[in-house]
């Protein structure tokens, strides 16, 4: 055993020495930097690019790229080099000139990125994010102390080195060693540091460090009126610009992530909405105007904002709703962007904008229906065009669509407690708004979905039949996104009669009867198809997740009121054991709930249409299709209370 330990120790020491040697080889050039042209700069409120020896305006027409891919989580680097190469070609074909990533990507991402630009005349430039770990944001330690700052600065250094092809990274999450050898710095437009900052974190940091002295750096300084977060930003940005300039002889544009929750504007929201405001009277604002660049900076700084038309409340009820655009429409989104541009002396980039093509909505845009969900793919595309027009007419220097690809691992605020965190990447939750912002969708199944409700039976086989009675057949199948049903042989489907499919999903729940219907076993859900009156998914009260998701899982300052309202909603149902009602989910916000506005969305209302992408009348959100005596319907797993269909896990309520 002693010899084994000795041998293991020698092996570890040898590996460490090899890594040190490689790192020394990568960084031996530090004292002999080579000067590089700075090809991007800011000029007042414009970004400019150096082309053929002269500076010309550069409008960012970009798209964000995430790290999600079906079956893998982001830290697994599960997207191949070949996939990235294909994606860059598609992004170039749609006339985008910029991409943005949020943190260091895999080495093969940068390899494919370099190869694309080396072989294409029209380049795609990169806005590189520098990750800010959430554990730092919510730790009790002060972010401005040297220990915490050093963690952020080391991640920054690692990111810069990776872009210049001079980095070796050991990923503690996966155990992988990543070698970055492709220098893509010629194709880097700039950096966006950090994340959407939690407003309570910003407020806490400012109050905790009240009275701190401004920072005076070689490249960036903070003004006298800067708060603690802005002072930290000046230190962070100064470190990055100084390190890259002194080490690699180049400068890139610089920005810091921001969003409406921490913007520097004064947003007057309708007084009634303040009842549940957790951030009222806070100091939660970040203003880049309180950062000052020195003469050493040849590149410049831009303001970065992630702005969506449906959030926050100030865009739905505040002063911005009074603005009428040149098309004669109320347009609070454009007005808000105009105020951002007016406020800043530097270019403003909308680094995230978009709407998801999810089946159901959460936050709603009451003015132009640019809502967070409830859009099919066609409506999503139209919404993106409208938002980009707003970005241009507001005077922004560009915008970046959120996002390139759908991401199955994502969770949404109104669904996060209803799915298994460890299994989200293995299936597609059609109810999750966060999973469907992508321009690129991932079909479940092997290359295509198991079935598209389109009124055709070519996708069905004898093996799918589960019940047969005379000339009537019921067939079923499933994939990573839906469970599918097909009824064939009922000649009176369009005569106003209903088809009822009873489903027993949950143990110790359900009922054996309801109005006009009896069941051999307790059932939890009813799929009710009616060509004239509309179709719906009904849920028994024992299996209802809607109120549960608000009352039990919503952490808010006014949680007592939520419990009370939940009880009022649930009691009438619990006293009637045969009650079925349309399946619902939380919608809007806690504000809506406390103000007696509609807190729930009837997601069980089924939409008729053709879900086949090859159809001329394709509707990506169609739930069912009737064609002659054929009825096809698909139901998302989550609407049947599946917690993780990949592991056959369901949510149980009101059980011991």
Where are these regions (language model features)?
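Active-site-adjacent substrate/metal-binding segments within catalytic domains
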Residues: 34-116
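Aromatic-lined substrate-binding rim segments of carbohydrate-active enzymes
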Residues: 83-144, 151, 241-246
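Active-site groove signature of glycoside hydrolases
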Residues: 158-226, 250-260
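Aromatic-lined carbohydrate-recognition surfaces of secreted/lumenal glycan-active proteins
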Residues: 171-176, 230-288, 346-353, 401-404
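Glycoside hydrolase catalytic-domain groove-lining segments
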Residues: 279-366
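Aromatic-rich peripheral "rim/lid" segments of glycoside hydrolase catalytic domains that contact
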Residues: 363-369, 379, 390, 394-397, ...
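Order/disorder boundary and secretion-linked terminal/linker segments
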Residues: 427, 431-554, 558, 585-610
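Conserved small/polar residues in nucleotide/adenosyl-binding loops
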Residues: 654-655
């Amino acid at each position: 055993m002693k010899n084994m330990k000795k041998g293991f120790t020698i092996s570890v020491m040898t590996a460490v020495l090899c890594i040190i040697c490689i790192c020394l080889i990568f960084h031996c050039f530090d004292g002999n930097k080579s000067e590089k042209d700075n090809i991007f700069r800011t000029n007042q409120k414009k970004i400019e690019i150096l082309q053929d020896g002269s500076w010309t305006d550069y409008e960012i027409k970009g798209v964000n790229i995430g790290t999600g891919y079906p079956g893998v989580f982001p830290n697994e680097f599960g997207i191949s080099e070949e996939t990235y190469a294909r994606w860059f070609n598609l992004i170039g074909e749609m006339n985008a000139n910029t991409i943005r990533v949020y943190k260091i990507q895999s080495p093969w991402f940068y390899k494919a990125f370099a190869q694309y630009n080396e072989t294409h005349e029209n380049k795609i430039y990169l806005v590189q994010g520098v990750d800010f770990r959430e554990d730092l944001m919510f730790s009790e330690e002060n972010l401005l102390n040297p220990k915490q700052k050093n963690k952020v600065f080391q991640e920054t250094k690692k990111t810069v080195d990776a872009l210049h092809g001079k980095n070796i990274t050991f990923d503690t999450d996966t155990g992988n060693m990543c070698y970055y050898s492709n220098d893509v710095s010629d194709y880097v437009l700039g950096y966006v540091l950090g994340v959407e900052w939690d407003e309570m974190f910003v407020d806490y940091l400012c109050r905790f460090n009240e009275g701190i002295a401004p920072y005076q750096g070689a490249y960036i300084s903070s003004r006298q009126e800067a708060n603690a977060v802005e002072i930290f930003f000046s230190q962070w940005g100064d470190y990055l610009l100084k390190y890259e300039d002194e080490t690699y002889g180049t400068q890139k544009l610089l920005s810091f992530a921001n969003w409406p929750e921490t913007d520097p504007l004064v947003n007057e929201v309708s007084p009634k909405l303040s009842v549940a405001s957790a951030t009222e009277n806070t100091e939660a604002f970040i203003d880049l105007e309180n950062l000052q660049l020195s003469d050493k900076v040849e590149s410049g700084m831009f303001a970065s904002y992630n702005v969506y038309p449906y959030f926050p409340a100030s865009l739905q009820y505040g002063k911005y709703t009074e603005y009428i655009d040149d098309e004669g429409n109320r347009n609070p989104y454009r007005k808000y962007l105009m105020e951002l541009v007016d406020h800043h002396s530097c270019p403003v980039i909308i680094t995230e904008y978009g709407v998801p093509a999810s089946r159901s909505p959460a936050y709603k845009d009451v003015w132009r229906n640019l809502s967070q969900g409830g859009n099919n793919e066609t409506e999503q595309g139209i919404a993106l065009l409208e938002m980009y027009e707003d970005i241009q007419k507001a005077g922004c220097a560009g915008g970046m669509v959120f996002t390139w690809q759908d991401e199955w691992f994502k969770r949404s605020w109104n669904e996060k407690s209803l799915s298994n965190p460890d299994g989200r990447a293995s299936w597609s939750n059609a109810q999750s708004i966060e999973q469907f912002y992508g321009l690129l969708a991932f079909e479940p199944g092997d290359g295509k979905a198991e079935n598209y409700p389109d009124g055709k039976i070519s996708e069905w086989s004898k093996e799918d039949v589960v019940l047969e009675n005379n000339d009537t057949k019921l067939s079923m199948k499933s994939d990573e996104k839906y469970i599918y049903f097909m009824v064939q042989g009922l000649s009176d489907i369009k005569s106003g009669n209903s088809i009822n499919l009873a489903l027993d999903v949950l143990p110790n729940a359900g009922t054996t009867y309801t109005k006009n219907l009896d069941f051999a076993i307790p059932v939890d859900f009813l799929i009710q198809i009616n060509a004239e009156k509309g179709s719906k998914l009904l849920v028994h009260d024992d299996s209802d997740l809607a109120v549960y998701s608000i009352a039990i899982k919503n952490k808010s300052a006014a949680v007592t009121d939520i419990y009370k309202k939940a009880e009022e909603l649930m009691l009438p149902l619990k006293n009637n054991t045969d009650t079925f009602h349309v399946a619902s989910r939380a919608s809007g916000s806690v504000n809506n709930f406390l103000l007696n506005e509609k807190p729930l969305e009837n997601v069980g209302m089924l939409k008729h249409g053709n879900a086949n992408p090859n159809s001329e009348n394709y509707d990506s959100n169609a739930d069912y299709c009737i064609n002659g005596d054929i009825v096809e319907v698909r139901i998302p797993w989550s609407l049947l209370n599946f917690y993780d269909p990949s592991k056959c896990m369901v949510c149980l309520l009101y059980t011991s």
